[in-house]
Amino acid sequence: MQNISPKVQNQINMLQQMQQQMQTILSQKSQYELAAQEARRAVEELKETDDSAAVYMNVGTVVMQKPKSEVISKVTEKIETLEIRIRSIEKQEKMLQEKFEKLQSQVRSEIEGRKTPDAN
């Protein structure tokens, strides 16, 4: 590691930062996917519920009784919003992965390029 140029050391630091960003992105994606899955289950349960049944929904810090159709509509909107966020995160993930792989390849080339003259 002592023979590594400052440029390569900087690139290695950038790779580490990208890994941390990727972990953050994957964590967010996982949270959104879980929330979307829970919301889909809620919609399925609501659809199976009798139309005359009391349905409650969080409105800020208050739980209020709402018409079943309104709750289904609100939860469906939430699912759509979460799916948009998931797709956006997947795009970020793909772009970051491509940048990571490109930079990783450059670092490998630099390191292997430095090792080759020493072997001769």
UniProtKB/Swiss-Prot annotation:
Domain of life of the source: Archaea
Transmembrane segments: none
Keywords assigned: Chaperone, Cytoplasm
Database matches in Pfam families: Prefoldin_2
InterPro entries, sorted: PFD_beta-like, PfdB, Prefoldin
Cell location: Cytoplasm
GO cellular component: cytoplasm; prefoldin complex
Function: Molecular chaperone capable of stabilizing a range of proteins. Seems to fulfill an ATP-independent, HSP70-like function in archaeal de novo protein folding.
Family membership noted in the UniProt record: Belongs to the prefoldin subunit beta family.
Summary of subunit composition and partner proteins: Heterohexamer of two alpha and four beta subunits.
Protein name (database record): Prefoldin subunit beta
Species this protein is from: Methanospirillum hungatei JF-1 (strain ATCC 27890 / DSM 864 / NBRC 100397 / JF-1)
